[in-house]
Regions:
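A structural signal for the principal folded core domain
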Residues: 1-201
């Protein structure tokens, strides 16, 4: 399920890489709970119980979570987005209950949590974005990034805004790692391993 500037659509994806089958389409642009509930009803989701993959915003709607910048935006754990040491703390309690008016839950869920697939592309984009943003813009590594992506504006590159094909191009560039510091090389290797072995490439 996904929306664009002009429509919202749901497609059925076969696990053996057959063609996508569109199962729902609407010109409504906003991913509201009412719209998604109607789409699920029209495709008779309750009898099929397909696995669902979507971006994190849509997953929040499916799970009945409050939208926007909230204290607990994750549907898997109780990560506190406003915690001062949120990146220092690595383990957060699992979200076991979806009780309305607790931990940013404002409605019942439309899809069981076990039926939601974490969107690997969005995770991959976030990993690479954060890595690129951590680079010093005056470094040799950043200058090499500019050479790899001459058409990307400096602002986009500094913000780490890459798409899927850009990420593939960067991961295939064998010389990029040689411009990184030792610590950055360790982080880069870890990101590549997670990207290839966990998220799939």
């Amino acid at each position: 399920m996904d929306s664009s500037e002009s429509s919202f659509k749901a497609v059925l994806i076969h696990k053996q890489s057959l063609k996508f089958i569109p199962v729902a389409y609407t010109k409504a642009k906003k991913e509201t709970r009412d719209l998604i509930g109607t789409v699920l009803e029209k495709i008779n989701y309750s009898s099929h119980q397909w696995l669902v993959s979507a971006d994190f915003k849509l997953i929040a709607v499916l799970m009945g979570l409050q939208g926007g910048y909230t204290q607990h935006p994750c549907y898997i754990c109780l990560w506190r987005s406003r915690e001062k040491n949120q990146y220092a703390e690595h383990y957060w309690a699992q979200r076991t209950e979806y009780e309305i008016n607790q931990n940013n839950v404002n409605a019942t869920f439309l899809v069981e949590r076990e039926k939601v697939l974490v969107p690997p592309l969005h995770i991959r984009l976030g990993l690479f974005k954060n890595f690129i943003k951590s680079l010093d813009t005056d470094s040799v590594a950043f200058a090499h990034l500019r050479a790899i992506f001459p058409r990307l504006s400096n602002a986009k590159l500094q913000a780490g805004v890459l798409n899927g094909p850009d990420i593939r191009k960067l991961t295939r560039n064998t010389s990029f790692a040689s411009f990184l510091s030792n610590e950055q090389q360790i982080a880069w290797k870890a990101i590549l391993e997670v990207s290839e072995q966990v998220l799939g490439n």
